């Protein structure tokens, strides 16, 4: 009546209470876990690379001009624009002509960008002459006569379009 099993009886436990690992089942689980971890690392790395590629700056291209914003009159009755980008032509004019501001309603701010990248800003009023405005722009940025005439026609169209709204 021996209570201790004999080594040849076919039990799965080794002496000392350890499991018999010779069948490879646990090794298969460990290999599977390692392979899964490696795959997860590769997927995360690929996602990071894709995110980096997506956030790189695109090649520079000309930006759309800002939308024209309605600026209400001040309570004191003055019509000074609060937009510093659109400066009045009388202040920045270097031609020496000190024409007073037309008393008409301000329609829009014309910004002409030359080929060199210089921007000329002129405020166009309701009573302005398109020829005078195109001359003022060409005083800051030399224009060919055909370009000056095309600018004059475009200013006429814009004034007519905005006057029909008012």
UniProtKB/Swiss-Prot annotation:
Query: Pfam families, alphabetically?
Result: UPF0561
**Source domain of life:** Eukaryota
Cite the residue spans of the region called Disordered: 36-108
> Which InterPro entries does this one have?
UPF0561
| Biased composition, class Basic and acidic residues, residue ranges | 36-49
Recorded family membership: Belongs to the UPF0561 family.
Name of the protein this chain belongs to: UPF0561 protein C2orf68 homolog
What species does this protein belong to? Bos taurus
